[in-house]
Amino acid sequence: MTRVAILTREYPPEVYGGAGTHVEYLARELRRLTEVSVHCWGAPRDEPGVTNHQAWDALSEPKPEAAALQAMSINLAMAAAVKGVDVVHSHTWYANLGGHLAKLMWSVPHVMTIHSLEPLRPWKSEQLGGGYALSTFCEQTAIEGADAVVAVSKGVREDVLSCYPRVDPDRLHVIHNGIDPDIYKPQPSPETLARFGIDADRPFALFNGRITRQKGLPLLLAAALRLDPRHQLVIVASSPDTPEIAGEVAGLAQRVRDERGNLVWIDRFIPREDLIHLHTHADVFVCPSIYEPFGLVILEAMACETAVVASRVGGIPEIVVQGETGYLVDYNSDDTETFTTELAGRINELLTDNALARKMGKAGRRRVLDHFGWPAIAARTVELYDSLRPAVA
């Protein structure tokens, strides 16, 4: 049985994005097929086979650059801790360097999954300062030396080859993200709506995501000014990347409140159960990202039978079927006015036509059941592990 070490920043209960959710479910399914250990950041976990690693205190300054140096210190600890495994599998730049160092030290294959690419996220320089150059260095070093690179969408595969032309295309494998439809399924809860101050008698559009440039929240707030004022916009968003983006979003949100009202803002992390309830009652889920390698939040919405309006970027067109499970809106950074106008138009259409929204929502869940199950994803991943082992035997 192949012994696999998964290296990741996020792991339950410390999960804040799609990559962490991916690792959670992938590890669960892989354990049914092979031996798995997990190495993650943060506090100790009670789960067997999970080891936490923490940054060196001596690297706490200068800010914000120290964050990247702290990440590298955790990677050193991870690399040292995985001696004796057969395969190392890293996720995101926060753990990729650890996988690369483990490959060099212990002569084991390194598999890395690409959830996003640093060269395509220039706004991260606001958060990391000069540390952004280090995050890109970690990613590039690891991806060019990895034995196999998993792209979570065809769009990501193309992006890898564009950003890092030295990567051998034969080492790139597309294995889509997935979801557990037994967890994410329609679950009505009028009580949850009441608790968050959402009017159950008014249609509403839902956004769920971090306050970052990537997720396009400023664009959604601009589009909100064109939404029918009778309809509600519910936003679940917190953890801003920087004070600058926090201030910008707060100003836009206040303008929406002043000019149209019916904005419900949930500015904290909410349990998965509550989010599923919101998806179930929402008439449309909105994903206005300007960069989205895959879009796991879209799968979550579709699994709950919610129609989707999303940007036509990255891997999203591989999830949303135009006119069947929702609508895709073309994004052009040079013409955001057209984007926000068309985004608002599609949202208004689905908030007004309940029958169409329900039809698209049901089609979305069928698509999730047919194409995005975790057991098949884990099986393909184990096949990839096994294909690499003879090369280093």
Where are these regions (language model features)?
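Carbohydrate-associated surface elements
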Residues: 155, 178
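Short alpha-helical donor nucleotide-sugar binding micro-motif in glycosyltransferases
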Residues: 277-282
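Short His-centered aromatic/hydrophobic patch
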Residues: 90-95, 114
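Aromatic "clamp/platform" in nucleotide-sugar-dependent glycosyltransferases that forms part
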Residues: 290
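Nucleotide-activated donor-binding/catalytic signature segment of Leloir-type glycosyltransferases, i.e.
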Residues: 246-269, 273
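A conserved mid-protein helix/loop that constitutes part of the nucleotide-sugar donor-binding site
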Residues: 21, 203-226, 247
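Short hydrophobic beta-strand element within catalytic cores of glycosyltransferases
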Residues: 307-310, 320
